[in-house]
């Protein structure tokens, strides 16, 4: 069974044993330890490690959710996380767009700003359009989640589009 424990989502007073945020916060519970820090392509500020349980005994009062449903709950956290990744990606895309727009407005070629050239202005328009479309996908996925509706597909679509837009814009 897999599960996720974070300080943001766990009542640490209720779940003293598994309130894991960082390896150094790991309580001295027999059979519970943090693995190596994972090397990630992005979002390096988030410390991601495996939680190793070797013959660990979790007291009943520290069990969260239904025993045997940990993997299902884990997958649900990934769905919600996709909304956050989409939001971060769109922020990156917007920052890149604003910088590109600023640069295209001040960079002169042939006596005029390069923003006035069709090739550059089309690229800027495409960036703005894709950012706006990604934002709508993100808001829709977030609205579905907030209103208790299924959002798995929409969250995945928002993350895909937003991360693609961020890569193109950068």
At which residue positions do the language-model features occur?
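FAD-binding core of flavoproteins
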Residues: 1-102, 112
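Active-site lining segments that contact anionic ligands and/or coordinate catalytic metals
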Residues: 48, 80, 152, 157, ...
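Amphipathic alpha-helix face/heptad-repeat signature
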Residues: 86-93, 120-123, 127-130, 158-161
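C-terminal helix-coil-helix/basic helical segment that borders enzyme active sites and/or dimer interfaces
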Residues: 101-115, 128-161
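Short, intrinsically disordered, charge-balanced linker/junction segments flanking boundaries
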Residues: 162-170
């Amino acid at each position: 069974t897999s599960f996720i424990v974070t300080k943001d989502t766990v009542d640490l007073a209720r779940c003293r044993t598994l309130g894991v945020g960082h390896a150094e916060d790991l309580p001295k519970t027999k059979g519970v330890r943090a693995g190596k820090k994972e090397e990630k392509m992005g979002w390096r500020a988030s410390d991601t490690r495996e939680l190793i349980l070797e013959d660990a005994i979790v007291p009943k009062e520290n069990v969260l959710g239904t025993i045997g449903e940990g993997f299902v709950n884990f997958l649900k956290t990934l769905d919600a996380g996709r909304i956050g990744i989409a939001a971060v990606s769109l922020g990156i895309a917007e920052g890149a767009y604003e910088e590109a727009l600023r640069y295209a407005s001040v960079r002169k070629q042939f006596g005029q700003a390069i923003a006035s050239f069709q090739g550059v202005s089309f690229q800027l328009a495409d960036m703005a359009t894709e950012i706006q479309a990604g934002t709508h996908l993100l808001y829709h996925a977030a609205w579905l989640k907030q209103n208790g509706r299924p959002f798995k597909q929409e969250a995945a679509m928002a993350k895909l589009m937003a991360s693609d837009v961020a890569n193109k814009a950068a």
